[in-house]
Amino acid sequence: IMKILLTNDDGYDAKNIKTLYEKLSENHEVWIIAPKNNCSGMSAAISYLNEIEVTKIDEKIYAVDGTPADCSYLGLLSIVDFEFDIVVSGINHGANIGNDVLYSGTVGAAIGGRNLKYPPIAISVASYDAKDIDYIANKSCEIINKIFNSKQTLKGKVININFPDISEE
């Protein structure tokens, strides 16, 4: 069982993060620590000049009035009193490929995890309204499990996974 910090840049109540949370929670301990509002395009920016408010929404769900990277840092350093095994950012509404990764808050949140020496995975789907988000979430879980169970070091790396808008059919 992994302890997973799940974040994104689309907001804690976005459909895709909720779906991934449900699927990952079937076999793992998962906490959503994600932006209060949509923060797409924030890259790995941090809120060093602003006070950041954290709101507990549910037992394992926190909304952060800050950037996606703020969510990773706060989740890993102060919100909980244990260590996570991995940081997962996504599932992003829209692909993060090519130059998009330079601006992506989804990738930025994963970079925050990497900067604190945690294995990070960013996940995106090439659609703002995926045909079958349950299928994408299930495939994401399979990949996350394989990467984590491989015991290969992700030190200094960010895994960036992009799915086409596909369904199980």
Name each region found by the language model.
Residues I4, K15-S78, F82-E83:
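A cross-family phosphate/adenosyl-ligand binding-site feature
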Residues L6-D13, D100-V101:
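Short, glycine-rich nucleotide/cofactor-binding loops
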Residues I86:
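Short, Asp-centered acidic motifs that coordinate Mg2+ and/or phosphate
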Residues A95-S104:
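Glycine/threonine-rich flexible loop motifs
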Residues A109-G113:
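Hydrophobic/aromatic ligand-binding patch that stacks against planar heteroaromatic rings
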Residues R114-I136:
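Glycine-rich phosphate/pyrophosphate-binding loops
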Residues Y135-E169:
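Electrostatically charged, flexible surface regions
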